A protein has these predicted regions:
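Mid-to-C-terminal alpha-helical segments outside catalytic/metal-binding sites
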Residues: 205-234
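Short, charged low-complexity intrinsically disordered segments located at boundaries
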Residues: 47, 175-176, 229-234
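Short alpha-helical scaffolding segments that buttress acidic/His motifs in well-ordered protein cores
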Residues: 9-10, 179, 224
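Secretory-pathway/luminal and periplasmic proteins that interact with or process carbohydrate-rich
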Residues: 37, 83, 229-233
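Short, surface-exposed recognition loops or helix-turn segments adjacent to catalytic cores
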Residues: 26-32, 72-77
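Second-shell residues forming the walls of enzyme active-site clefts
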Residues: 48-216
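A substrate-binding/cap region within the structured catalytic cores of diverse enzymes
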Residues: 1-22, 29-50, 57, 61
Length: 234
């Protein structure tokens, strides 16, 4: 295939979603499948080399958004380098910063350049970036790298916090607070309403106690409002 086909496929998907009343597609997957047999990514990846994934991922994001649907590049900073399934366990990827820059991060740079409206985080340890917290809960990954070095101004959404990699260690609601403090705009709890409500309560209490960085919190609210405004104009 070619990049134009990726754009057209994304556009068709976006158009079909709009016909069904949907406006947010948690795609494309821009993980480079550098480890074969990856159970969480597998055939969802565009390929095993960064150049291919970069080309197709950016164009698919453009296509989805050309149809008036928000796209989401995932899973930052890269889920392709492990065969551990984050739905069950917490993996570690031991790439250096230089190796990350040369491989897994390349498609994300391209997606940002393409104007992707959101980026989803991954529940993986990257010791080169943060020895204590996985990507989803790491200020070094979300604020310093994605917001700072990569200059990303769109929405950061987490992967589902009820997945085994996170819930079994932190609890989903507690992780939502940690993710928000680390720089996530939209902590995602996709199964349990009660757990989502508890997460909202924990974040509200943290605000009341002065534990949140309020300029950053307000900036997150502004990014979400901006996305809603963009969608309303489509």
């Amino acid at each position: 295939g070619n990049a134009e086909e990726a754009f057209l496929t994304g556009k068709r998907i976006g158009e079909a979603m709009r016909e069904m009343g949907l406006n947010y597609d948690l795609a494309p997957v821009v993980d480079v499948e550098s480890v074969c047999g990856n159970p969480a990514i597998g055939s969802r990846s565009f390929g095993t080399d960064a150049a291919t994934v970069t080309r197709f991922g950016a164009e698919m994001a453009r296509g989805i958004q050309a149809a008036g649907v928000m796209a989401c590049a995932k899973h930052f900073p890269g889920h392709g380098g492990t065969n551990v399934d984050t739905h069950k366990s917490l993996p570690t990827i031991t790439l250096s910063m230089e190796e990350l820059e040369a491989g897994p991060l390349v498609p994300f740079y391209a997606a940002i350049e393409a104007g992707v409206k959101s980026i989803m985080t991954t529940h993986i340890m990257f010791p080169a970036l943060d020895k204590e917290y996985p990507g989803t809960l790491s200020g070094a990954v979300l604020s310093a790298l994605l917001r700072g070095k990569m200059r990303y101004g769109g929405i950061i959404i987490t992967d589902c916090l009820e997945m085994g990699a996170i819930a079994s260690r932190y609890g989903a609601a507690e992780a939502a607070l940690l993710a928000a403090k680390a720089g996530a705009d939209m902590p995602l709890i996709s199964h349990s309403y009660n757990e989502a409500a508890r997460a909202a309560e924990l974040i509200s209490r943290a605000i009341e106690r002065g534990e949140m960085n309020m300029p950053e919190h307000n900036a997150a609210l502004g990014r979400i409002a901006g996305a809603k405004e963009w969608l309303s104009m489509q």
